[in-house]
Amino acid sequence: MSKADDLRSQLIRSFATPDASWSTFKREPHYESEGVRLARGTAAKKLGMSVDIVPPGKRACPYHFHYAEEEAFIVLEGSGTLRVAGEMLPITAGDVIFIPPGPEYPHQILNTSDAPLKYLSLSVNAELEICEYPDSDKVGVAV
């Protein structure tokens, strides 16, 4: 393997190729999305990145907040609603969403349209992460 090939395998990922590893996250009737995790297996140590597609009428994940991780979302296609801090904010293609850590910013992305909602997720992966789910009074810990 050449140095260029090695660098490419450690630094570049594509979600637009047939061999991209898409997976489905589904918990009926609440959550459903299809996504490809891009940072896994790369040289990145503290970044998480994925492309997610949420079908019409579905939510990507539970309403939650992180104690350590920051997140950003770039809406690539479609429109929907960002549920954040008890408010419902419209989102559409071209919007960039910044979510700081902490209980002030519980968040959830909902597809409230009749077309798929596609977005890029970016996160700073913490060594120890606590995630809280206000709707269900659950807490998750990742190490």
Regions found by a protein language model. Name each.
Residues 62, 82-83, 99, 106-113:
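Short beta-strand His + acidic residue motifs that chelate non-heme Fe in jelly-roll/DSBH
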Residues 43, 68, 103, 114-115:
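Short strand-connecting beta-turns/loops that link adjacent beta-strands
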Residues 32-37, 50-66, 104:
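Conserved short histidine dyad/triad with adjacent acidic residue
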Residues 85-102:
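Short acidic-glycine-tyrosine-enriched beta hairpin
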